[in-house]
Every structure is written in structure tokens, then in C-alpha cells.
Amino acid sequence: MNYLNENIDSLNKKLQDGEITAEDLAKETVKNIKETDKKINAWITVDEEAKPAENLDFNKNKLAGIPIAIKDNIITNGMKTTAASHILYNYMPVYDATVISKLKKAQATFVGKTNMDEFAMGSSTEHSYYGETHNPWNLDKVPGGSSGGSAAAVASGEVVAALGSDTGGSIRQPAAFNGIFGIKPTYGRVSRWGLIAFGSSLDQIGVMSKRVKDSAEVLNVIAGPDEHDATVSEQEVPDYTSFLGQDVKGLRVAVPKEYMDAVDGEMREVIQKQIDVLKDAGAIINEVSLPHTKYVVPTYYIVASSEASSNLQRYDGIRYGYRAKDTKNLLDVYVKSRSEGFGDEVKRRIMLGSFALSAGAYDEFFKKAAQVRTLICRDFEKIFEENDVIVGPTTTEPAFGIGEEISDPIKMYNNDLLTISANLAGIPAASVPAGLVDGMPAGLQIMAKRFDEGNVFKVADFIERNNKFYEKTPTGMED
């Protein structure tokens, strides 16, 4: 079964009516993945024996029997988890991430693990030990990253929803590139227990789907407290679907000058059109400034790389993962295992982070980056004193060609310009399809104050109802 024209509600109805069984749905999903993925490469692991939970309750659990894709940096008991790295090529977890446990309780079906940039470090899903993923809209283009596999799996109709992780835009940028919806919740809204760490003060698990409501349904399940994660919030989780179907009259919408100045031509026209739709519906549009936007890329890459260099120290070739052969002593095991096990981009960021944390550079780099991060947070706090949401482009350009930017790390890093501020500030942010630019999807980014995912869903759903982008079929999937 291909899900290009399906959603969680439609599948739930078919399951309730007996039009299809959960067992057949799992089998058909795997069959479709094996056919479709020959040209997409969205998956690292596909469970060909995928089975639904027992005693399914389709009335109580909207996700019962629904196949969900899982990014391969989220721990799954008994299913290989590699983070798209050679160093974890044979890692078989013995426990589930909290989000997986919650989805199991909701009786969702797991069909496999999706491709990604190694350890979530990248913006194109080209930095994977298992090969690059292709964009379903144009197979010669990247799907974005690092959650490019999850995005491509949804956009190509292999699944209706997928989990991703977002450290600097890794859900929102691929969502924009693939013409789907993707949301990064507030830092602490969803447990990170069982998420392979990249930047621990930035990482957040989120959801990707073709329809806004599908992400709301999944976030309803995975959000909330967790005894295993000290950073997760105890705040009550609202029913995110209750924010759908509302109008935006009177909603105060901020549009950052710096974000609009970062785009031009057709991209600017597409984004402005969606802003005008909100204005015509009665939203109050306010031009604002995020003055520290010019510092977000260096700030982010210092903070994220520093945290990564610390988190990745655990991969030493001793406890688990790849161990180099023909080593002479313990130090040789460490050096060779890490040199051979990590890819170039991961090693680049480890070196950058190790330097920023070194005694001679700490005050000059990491400490200053932390201070600028505080200023960035204050910029957002000031705007949210008089505005409900912030909107603007998700990316500065549509998807670029495979191989075009992989040899230019600085150009690749600058792709994150418009998304990383939300991670530095810890606020919820999403990307919803806005239209096409040069035949490729472009996304409208929506941000709100901490724990106000409701307004993000409200605006995204309004945009979706207006432009009905979900009715479009990716051109790379047309026969």
C-alpha cells in the first residue's frame, strides 16, 4: 500500500471497518517500501517480519496498527540502531527509547529505521555510511538532513508519519525540502531518553507527516513526563488536535526582517503569499527584528560541536560498536576504531568541538557562544511579549543537487541559518509546505513561545487548509 493519499484518520477508518487488517497493512507497507525505496534509499533497516500489536483497540488508539517510521538514532529494542555510522554498524539495543515505549503502548506498528546524516550531523543525508537518500520530488536532489530518510519516506508515500530528531533544523529543513509537515517541539516537551546524543542542550525528538493532524496525533502520544529524562517537562500535554480547524483572526504574527531579507525571487514570493493569506484572514502582521540572527550559525556550531565532542567520547571500540583490527595496544584501539568508525563530517565536528573546549580556546569560543546564545533567547522573549507566533521561510533555498555542497562545509552549515535559532532558544518550531520554487517544495516556518505548540499547529493547519499542498504528488514518484 502506498500512502500518498492516506492519513491516520483514513487508515484508522479502514481498520475499524475491516476494509484491511493490521497484519495486511504491515505486509503491504513493507512490500511498498521494498519497491519504492529502490530509487529513494530512505531506509537503513526494514523489518520484513513487521507485525502489529495484539488486541488492537482502534477506537481508543488512533495509532493502533498504523505503520510508523523511526529515525535510526532512536533506540529500538531488538532492532538494529546505527545512527547511520560505521562505528555502530552492528549495535542491537536491549531497551526502547521512551518515545518508542509510548508508541508501543498506543499500539503503533514499527516497520524499520530511516536513513540520516551520521549521528545527525548534516543537512543533506549525504553523510551516511549507508549511502545518500534521494528527494522524491527530484531524485537528483537531496532530501535535506539530518532526518532526510524520515522525510523522504513520508513524502514518497512509504508511511504516513515518521519520527525524526532536530538539533539545528533536522526535522524542519527536510520537511521543507520534501513538501511535508514537520515539527520540533519545545525542548523538554518530548523525552530524549534513548535518543543517541548529538548536542544534548539542543536535541529534540519530533514528528514528520504529510498532514498536520497526523503529527498532532503522534505528538499527543510521545509528549509528556518521563522518569528517565531529567530535562523533560512535567507540564500537562494538551490535545494538539483541538487546535486544528480554527481561524487566525486577531492572531499576532511576527515576521522577522532578517529572515525575509535572507530570501529573494520566487522563494520570497511564495513565503509572502502565505503571510498575505494569514493577513487576509484577520491575523495581525508585525515586522520585527531578530538582531542576533547574523551570529546564530557560528554560535550554534561552537555549542553543538562542543557537546558532540563530549557525547561521542563514549565510542571507543571497547564497550560496543566497531573495533579496529590489528591494533598494538589500548591507545591504538581507541585511535584506529574512531578514525575508521567515524565519517569525515563527524570527525570534523569532533575536532572543532574539542578545540572550542580546550583550555586555550574555551573563554574565546565556547564561553562567548554561550553568552550570545543568551542574547538570542532574549530576542525571542522580547518578540513574544507582543506576538503569538513568528513566521518566515524555513530555508533560504529549495533542495540543492546531490553532491553540490558536500565538499563545502561552510556553505552546508549556512543552510541552517533560519532554523537553528529555535534550537538555541528551545522554542517549538515547525515547517509547513508553502508552495513550489523552481518545481521543488518550499516551507513556511512557524515558531511560538515555549510549550505553545498549540499555536504552531493552529497556523500550520490554517495554511494547509488554504493551499492543500498535500494533494500534490512528488514529481519524482510519478510513473
From Swiss-Prot:
One of the GO biological process terms: translation
GO cellular component: glutamyl-tRNA(Gln) amidotransferase complex
Keyword NADP appears in the UniProt entry: no
E.C. number: 6.3.5.7
Keywords: ATP-binding, Ligase, Nucleotide-binding, Protein biosynthesis
Enzyme class, first EC level, given as a word: ligase
Substrates-to-products reaction catalysed: L-glutamyl-tRNA(Gln) + L-glutamine + ATP + H2O = L-glutaminyl-tRNA(Gln) + L-glutamate + ADP + phosphate + H(+)
Catalytic machinery residues: 71 (charge relay system), 146 (charge relay system), 170 (acyl-ester intermediate)
GO molecular function: ATP binding; glutaminyl-tRNA synthase (glutamine-hydrolyzing) activity
HAMAP family tied to this protein: GatA (MF_00120)
The family this protein is said to belong to: Belongs to the amidase family. GatA subfamily.
Subunit structure, as described in the record: Heterotrimer of A, B and C subunits.
Role according to the record: Allows the formation of correctly charged Gln-tRNA(Gln) through the transamidation of misacylated Glu-tRNA(Gln) in organisms which lack glutaminyl-tRNA synthetase. The reaction takes place in the presence of glutamine and ATP through an activated gamma-phospho-Glu-tRNA(Gln).
Protein name: Glutamyl-tRNA(Gln) amidotransferase subunit A
Gene behind this protein: gatA
